Amino acid sequence: MNIGTLILCPWDLSLRNLFLFFYLFLLSKILFLFAEIEMPVLHGDIAVADTTYKNAEPCTATEKGCKWPKEGRYVYVPYYISPDYKEQNIIIRGMRSFNQTTCIRFIPWNPSVRNYISFFTQPNSGCWSYLGRQKGVQHISLERGGCVRYSTVQHEILHALGFNHEQVRSDRDRYVRILFNNIKRKQQYNFQKKRTNNLETPYDFSSVMHYNKYAFSKNGLPTIEAKGDPAPAFGNARQMSTNDIIRVNKLYRCSKLKTYSTFYLLCEYV
């Protein structure tokens, strides 16, 4: 949609023209905000800005520049949910799970706030998020018809808070084998090991951030193989694990760390 250009001559600055000028200016900003969003995606569902190509490994490794700011005991994250969703309750439940188990507090966005996350859906937009806090509006794509699931909402929010996928942890080779011969060539970068801050927590096969064993397979064979006997199942988490919650509390230095069982979360949110 194109906005016509309004030319104000210096001798015709009537209140009516000034009002029309500012109306068109604000309308153009709103249309830009909700215009079609196309972002390069790293690690399957992690978006990176065209200008910086920043990803989250340095964020959680250095804890500088990627965390949302803390005010007192809490970390307030403003959010906006597109009215295109009929499933807003699922997104709200996902955010509420952080309010219940961590010091993260999701609060409705108001226009005076510059930094916030915005959940949106577009045809073929898929599921993705930025890694760590960005400046200004920070989009989280949850395409209707496939991405608006409780576990996916938690997964993408964890990216926005600064967390990477489990299977790219710096110590992953002790727990899994990455079968590169079975991975689509253009997707192999998704499995490269990264420098991560593991926050003194163990590798977690039950993490909501773990890929499943056939992720990006080119031939129907596994791309990730768990070590151990018996080999643990992984990649189909219905929600955040206990370790996922503990990591958020540690990274953001929440004052009272608690252990939340999977049973508690299932009873609370199913």
Task: List each model region and its residues.
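Zinc-dependent metalloendopeptidases
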Residues: 1-17, 26-270
